[in-house]
Amino acid sequence: MVQFGSRANTNMTGLPTEQAVEDRRVGNPKRDRMRNALVIVLGEFCGTFMFLLLSFIGAQTALVTNSPSDAGSPLLPFSLMYIAASFGTALAVNVWIFYRVSGGMFNPAVTLGLVLVGAVTPIHALLIIPTQLVAAITAAGITDALLPGKLLVTNALGNGTSVAQGVFIEMFLTSQLVLTVYFLAVEKHRSTHLAPIGIGISVFIAHICATNWTGTSINPARSFGPSVVAGFHGYDWIYYIGPFMGSLLAFGCYKIFKVLEYQTANPGQDDDNLDRSGHHHFFGHRKEPMPHTHTDNIEPKDHGVPQRNDSVIDDQMV
């Protein structure tokens, strides 16, 4: 490892040698890999923690005000909306913050989905998923410590929902979330930078649909954290198996569209010849040329946002 200031890497003046400067510029691949892994782990911990802390506090607030005289009563419409908004907006804002750091996954089912398409390496996934689980436990524990009363945000079946029904509800809703990630974040286009909004909306509508039936997990970490703090049910496995089944279902659907080269079926939609800027194509599928549009003269960078003309700005400042 290069150490600036050592005799081997400095000249008579005490300044770094040209070789030392070049080594620092090129970098140490092993050290860089370790640093990147650390950044990803820290990003996933911070993002998962903040997402779930805000979500748990919002959900706890809705649950304690839902029907104080009957804690087991079905959610009232305003309570349901409150919970859905808490999870959806908390996820959207934290994905927007951390997607450049770690990818903003915060969900083992999403991580599995990204591993399946090659967007996340299996080695990174082995670091990320335990980090997400620890962050979820931490968020649940702090929520329990901050707010009075019993922690109520554990997932549970309700209104006569069977275990089998719960598994498939979680599977289909998670598949919707993972497909949202695939087509808005993995597939690069001019609105990729708005993917956090779509992902948040997907979680919002999932909670509208399923909270009265399964409590809405769609995220094994979200279920695991509160269960560790407040206690497990006998059927907690449905909140782990269901979302992972949803990831597999979404991958199968996405794979079919990629094999069929879906881009050629409805050409020109959200497309500005992004192949020139390194459009990501998984599985090595070829993309047919698309007709030119009036925006083809814009060189898309940073998710399709045109670069500002710094020379013009500099001239104006002189």
UniProtKB/Swiss-Prot annotation:
Glycans are attached at residue 159. Its main location: nucleus. Residues 1-27, 268-318 are annotated as: Disordered. SUPFAM superfamilies: Aquaporin-like. Residues 1-16 have a biased composition (Polar residues). Residues 58-77, 130-165, 215-236 are extracellular. This is Aquaporin-1. The lineage of its organism: Eukaryota, Fungi, Dikarya, Ascomycota, Pezizomycotina. The gene is FgAQP1.
